Every structure is written in structure tokens, then in C-alpha cells.
């Protein structure tokens, strides 16, 4: 089962849809956002991306003249739009992160709730799994990803423990990993700690932040002037990248200026960041950490 779409009304309204326009849903998933966009189109066209083969099955009832599913990672958006004869689009929507379906499918290895292989690949055609990271990365490498992507406070100590443990026996299952983590998790906050470690591994396996950077950089090339960008993120690492790119035109530092001192920013923010209201958070657990940012191409 796929999750109830988060911030559905707000994210689609943020696109300011032209019924004859061309739009892209870069994270098709269960198709909730795509179906809502299609309701607003008449002569327009929607292209949707998803790298997960399970999600592709959800699109079968939508395939038609106004909808095309592209089974690929959104980091290649420019390439695949060109292959479909599309140069510029009117809007782009992204609902980042992991889907409820992926979490609730035990054998995918995304959840702390099930004993399963340490997989965590969104695209199961790629080779690297979470088990490969745990068992093959150096202590320094593990320390880095646990600290950067999971914001794990005792990342160095945990990295040392994982390296020591895998000498005796490879850590190949979620239960084996959690057994190691249990000795280092803050008392009373075990689930949060496990989730932080799993998040770090998932981001590394799928190169999520690098893919997001690629998407944002290419969005300024594929969006028409006046085109809208509507992005929902679920943790501070994602949101910071989106915020900085929209406000400064780059991921770090201040906006660049030309020879005349004019700021070079490809986007302007449309309103403030939007968080789900209390009712949606109560109704949809996944919405609790969501944040929507809308921007317009200059």
C-alpha cells in the first residue's frame, strides 16, 4: 500500500497549472500527486518519473495521450525529457524520501520493524546495498555517513563498533544491525536512533542528496520562465538544499553576482514554506515531518 499523498492540495496548487501545459511528477510512487495534476489538465501532458519497479505497476491505468511514465531516477530528468521530445516544462513536483509501500515491504530492508536483508535499494537494478556499506566501508566512511546523513551523535563510536563486529561475522540483516545498535542507543530513544542510522544508510545507498542536487540544477534548465517548482521534503538535509538553491541559486554560500553587482538567482520563492496543519498530521503520520517549498523560475 502506498501512502496517502502529503500536502496534496497545496503542492498541486503551487504549480499554478495551465490546462494546456506540460508538467512533471518526479516521484510517481502511488500516483496520488499525478492523479491530482491530471484532473487539472485538458490538452496538457504529464510526465512522471520513478526508479522503483513496484511504483511502475501503479501507472498502468493512467497510460494514455496525456500521461507518460518514465522508469528512471529523477536525477536524469533533462536527458529523459529530451528523449521524449520535451525541451521545456511548465511545472515540476517532487515528493521526496521513502514511500510507505517501501517501508511496509519487509524484504526491501527499509524498516526497523522487520527482520530482513539489509537492502534499502529504491532501484533494485543497482548493485550497492546497505549490507555492502556496513561490511565494506572504512571506519572513516561509516563515521562520515552516520554523522552527515543520520546526524547520529555518537557516529564515531558506532562506526568503530560496526567495524569490530563485522570482523567476527558480516552484518547482513536488519535484526543483526539493530542488535549492535542497541548497545549505543540513548535509553528511551532507541527507535529514533535506529531510524537515524537507517536513514543514513538509505541516503548513501540511493545517493539521495546527490540526486536531489542534480534535479534542482537541471530544473532551472527544463522549466520555462514563470514555471513552478513544488518540492516536499522530509528532513532538514533535503529541505536545506531546496531552500538554499531557491534563495541563493546554489547549495552553499551566498548568491553569485555578475560584473554589475546584480544577483544571479534562477528562482524566486512563492510564499513561505508550508507545513501540514494539525489535522493532516493527525490523519497522516508521514506528514509530520513534511515541508513544502514552492518557487518560480525567473
Curated annotation (Swiss-Prot):
Q: What does this protein do?
A: Specifically methylates the N4 position of cytidine in position 1402 (C1402) of 16S rRNA.
Gene3D superfamilies, A to Z: Putative methyltransferase TM0872, insert domain (1.10.150.170), Vaccinia Virus protein VP39 (3.40.50.150)
Q: What is the lineage of its organism?
A: Bacteria, Pseudomonadati, Bacteroidota, Cytophagia, Cytophagales
| Residue numbers binding S-adenosyl-L-methionine | 31-33, 50, 80, 95, 102
Reactions accelerated catalytically: cytidine(1402) in 16S rRNA + S-adenosyl-L-methionine = N(4)-methylcytidine(1402) in 16S rRNA + S-adenosyl-L-homocysteine + H(+)
Q: In Gene Ontology terms, what is one molecular function of this protein?
A: rRNA (cytosine-N4-)-methyltransferase activity
Q: Which UniProt keywords apply?
A: Cytoplasm, Methyltransferase, rRNA processing, S-adenosyl-L-methionine, Transferase
- This enzyme's EC code(s): 2.1.1.199
Query: What's the name of the protein?
Result: Ribosomal RNA small subunit methyltransferase H
Its main localization is: cytoplasm
Query: Where is it located?
Result: Cytoplasm
Q: Which organism is it from?
A: Cytophaga hutchinsonii (strain ATCC 33406 / DSM 1761 / CIP 103989 / NBRC 15051 / NCIMB 9469 / D465)
Q: Which gene encodes it?
A: rsmH
Q: Region (Disordered) spans which residues? A: 255-298
| Gene Ontology terms: biological process | rRNA base methylation
Family stated for the protein in its record: Belongs to the methyltransferase superfamily. RsmH family.
